[in-house]
Design a protein with these regions (language model features):
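Intrinsically disordered, low-complexity polar regions and short flexible loop motifs
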Residues: 89
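Amphipathic alpha-helical surface "interface" segments used
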Residues: 31-32, 126-129
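C-terminal cap/loop subdomain of S1 sulfatases and analogous C-terminal strand-loop tails that border
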Residues: 2-82, 86, 120-121
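Bilobed periplasmic-binding protein-like "clamshell/Venus-flytrap" ligand-binding domains
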Residues: 111-125
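C-terminal structured subdomain/cap of oxidoreductase catalytic cores
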Residues: 97-104, 108
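Carboxylate-dense, calcium-coordinating segments in secreted/extracellular and ER-lumen proteins
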Residues: 92-96
């Protein structure tokens, strides 16, 4: 479940009609303490950069800019599509994009379909305040 699912879940709770063309799923049963089903995939965003989580995999698209900042914190800027198995590699140290290209291409296609024109390779780093 993701925060964008609050809309459909709360809509169900109050008996509202939720449009079918929005990305929100009804998880009211989960809110009420019953076991629910998680999303299989989701697009995540941090400081204007997107990534895609599907099952055990994380797909990080290429972005322009420095790989790390002055404190050596990685910024998610790579010059190629990267794929990680989060179940086996939580630190995202082993890029599997060349090892399992069929998974990379499938997730890349799903990511691009989900994000449409929102994915841009040239994102300026936002200053955290």
């Amino acid at each position: 479940m993701a925060q964008l699912d609050f809309f459909a879940s709360l809509g169900h709770l109050v008996g509202g009609n939720v449009p079918e063309n929005i990305d929100s799923r009804d998880h009211l049963d989960t809110f009420l303490g019953n076991k629910g089903e998680a999303r299989e995939s989701i697009v995540l965003e941090a400081q204007g950069r997107l990534c895609y989580r599907s099952g055990d995999y994380a797909l990080i698209p290429p972005y322009k800019g420095p790989v790390a900042n002055i404190t050596k914190n990685e910024l998610g800027n790579l010059d190629h599509w990267s794929l990680f198995n989060l179940k086996e590699d939580r630190g995202q140290l082993n890029d599997l994009s060349a090892t399992i290209p069929e998974v990379l291409e499938e997730l890349k296609s799903d990511f691009l379909a989900a994000t449409g024109t929102f994915y841009k390779t040239d994102v300026k780093e936002e200053e955290l305040k």
